[in-house]
Design a protein with these regions (language model features):
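Short glycine/proline- and aromatic-enriched beta-strand/turn motifs that initiate or cap beta-hairpins
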Residues: 19-59, 204, 208-214, 223
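Outer-membrane beta-barrel channels and translocator barrels
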Residues: 24, 61-65, 111-113, 158-160, ...
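Residues that define the transmembrane beta-barrel architecture of outer-membrane proteins
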Residues: 25, 48-52, 98-102, 125, ...
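Residue-level detector of the transmembrane beta-barrel scaffold of outer-membrane proteins
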Residues: 28-30, 67-69, 128-130, 164-166, ...
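Residues on the lipid-exposed face of transmembrane beta-strands in outer-membrane beta-barrel proteins
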Residues: 31-35, 56-60, 104-108, 131-135, ...
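Outer-membrane beta-barrel translocator domains and adjoining extracellular loop/strand segments
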Residues: 42-46, 81-87, 117-120, 141-145, ...
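Gram-negative (and chloroplast) outer-membrane scaffold detector with strong preference
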Residues: 66-141, 209
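Predominantly the C-terminal beta-signal and adjacent terminal strand-loop region
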Residues: 81, 99, 160-223
Length: 223
């Protein structure tokens, strides 16, 4: 009986060692593409008027369940007074403005993310949520820079040991009412940080590559 238990213990030890043969990587770099849509006075539908979107992405892994992500993206937003139900006390108006943003986010994976060969119990496909802070530059007559607060969710897929495919959707809330070039079109003043302000959302599909292998003897992760 003791011999059998010893054999089982040895086998479990071997499996544990094999499960951690691949290194963990700290950094991801990649690029993505998708669509961006404006939501404000001249568009009340998040899925209407979508325009092309491109981005560069970087991600620093704190541990298999948490990461800090950097996103630099750009795209156009469009809108007009045509084909909307609300009446506006201005003449026909339309706009096409360029947005360029940079933001940092905290990401939380619902399960440990990986191939399962570098961290026991890690999964190749995991959902995640994200929240962050950034800056957005918008073109137009009232061009300028405003704060954006991205809140989103997505799915990560470990396609290969060092290749990742990430699909995400995030809403960017801003305190500005000039992304569309017009403010207070009804002339009614309102209070509140995000009340009657413009915002935009982006759906993004990105591919990234893992870099910077973690020291195998280091055990200073924060879990």
């Amino acid at each position: 009986m003791r011999i059998l238990l010893l054999i089982v213990a040895i086998q479990l030890s071997i499996l544990s060692i094999r499960a951690q043969e691949e290194p963990e990587y700290r950094l991801e770099l990649g690029a993505g593409a998708g669509t961006v849509a404006y939501y404000g006075d001249f568009n009340g539908n998040l899925f209407k008027g979508m325009q092309p979107w491109g981005a560069l992405v970087a991600r620093y892994h704190l541990n298999p369940r948490m990461a800090i992500a950097l996103n630099i993206g750009t795209g156009k937003i469009k809108g007009s007074t045509d084909n909307i139900d609300t009446w506006y006390p201005i003449e026909r108006y339309e706009f096409s403005h360029q947005l360029t943003e940079a933001d940092a986010r905290y990401e939380y994976n619902f399960w440990a993310y990986g191939t399962g060969q570098e961290y026991r119990g890690a999964r190749r496909v995991v959902p995640f949520i994200a929240i962050g802070f950034g800056l957005t530059h918008h073109s137009g007559e009232h061009s300028g820079v405003t704060v954006n607060l991205p809140i989103g969710a997505g799915v990560k897929w470990k396609v290969a040991s060092r290749v990742n495919l990430i699909a995400e959707w995030a809403m960017r809330f801003t305190p500005s009412d000039y992304l569309d070039g017009k403010s207070d079109v009804y002339g009614i003043k309102s209070s509140g940080l995000f009340k009657n302000t413009d915002c935009y959302s982006a759906f993004q599909l990105a591919v990234s590559y893992d870099l910077w292998a973690k020291c195998k003897t280091c055990n200073n992760d924060i879990y």
